[in-house]
Structures are given as C-alpha cells and as structure tokens.
Amino acid sequence: MLATVLLLLLLLVATFTDVRWHKIYNWTTYPGMLAAVAINACGTLILAYGDAQRWQPVLGWIPDVPNPLAASILGWLACGFVMLLCLVTFQIGGGDVKLIAMLGAFLGLEQGLVTMLWMLVLGGALGLVLLIWQVGIGRLLVKVGRHLKNVLKLGRHAPLPEEDRAYLQQPLYLAPTSIPAVLIVRLGVLDWLF
C-alpha cells in the first residue's frame, strides 16, 4: 500500500510538471527510485526474517517474487533500458526515461513493462484525441483520404506536406497517462470493469 500510494503521489507531481513546464524533474524521479529500492529491500529482509503476511499489505513491495529487491532492480534496468532506446530512436525526453525507470523500480519487470505499454497506448489515444480536437474530425478525414489517394497513385510512400506534418509534432505526454496505467496494472481496474 505504501509503495502504491507513494508511486501515485510521485506520478501526480510528474504529471503536473510535465503538463505545466514540459519537464519531469530529477527531484521527482531520483528519490522515487531510491524509495522503491528501499521498500523492496525491506520486503526482501522481511521475507527472509520477518512476518511477511503482516507487512506486505502495509509496505506493498513487489508481490509473488522470492527477492523483491532483485525484482526492483531488474524492473528499473529493463524499463530504463527500453526507454533509453526510445530516447535514442524517437523524440522521448530524458524525464520520461527516468519516470518509466522509476515505475520499473516500484513495479518490477513484468508489471513495469505492462504499465509502460499501457502508457504508450493511452498516450497515443490522448494524442489522437488532441489531434481531432485541433484539426476537426471532418478535416482530418479529408486530409487522411487525400494522403491515401496520393500514396495509391504513386504506388509508394508519399511524404506529408509540411503543414500536415506540423500537426503530428505534438509532444507525447507520458506522465499524465502513467496514473491510469498504474491503476490498470497495480490495482486491476480493468478487472473490476469486466
């Protein structure tokens, strides 16, 4: 419980700073990473020497693993590495890399990667909603139809005009999608709905 509440508070701060200033600050992510490792280290010690059934619901370390500390570090490394590849390949910011590495440290490998995928799906959906909001559904459908007609006429990929490309250069806000993604994965929100 403590781990999930702390993670959601950190994500709330990251969401605010990302939307307001387009930055996810180190003072949010680094202490979060350390807190995740500390909580999971306590979980490892309690599993070895203490009353795990009493303390796991309170602290909320990574469940169902023999060594929560190792799971935390593995999640941190894996999620951070995947996002580092995205940083090099795509236009993902460094704050997003650290944010998702922090998620991996809190959630472990499996839940961290699933949360990251949910964030990308929700971020893409949010981007599409913003695109429709800015351009309008009718105008967007006309532009897509015109582009598809050009592609079919040429028989190969046709570059978008600069005017249309400008709409696609919107930033991908991952921090705002992190909260619903964590709720979906950690608390099983979709399980409640279906």
Protein language model regions, located:
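A membrane-topology feature that recognizes alpha-helical transmembrane segments
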Residues: M1-I92, V97-F194
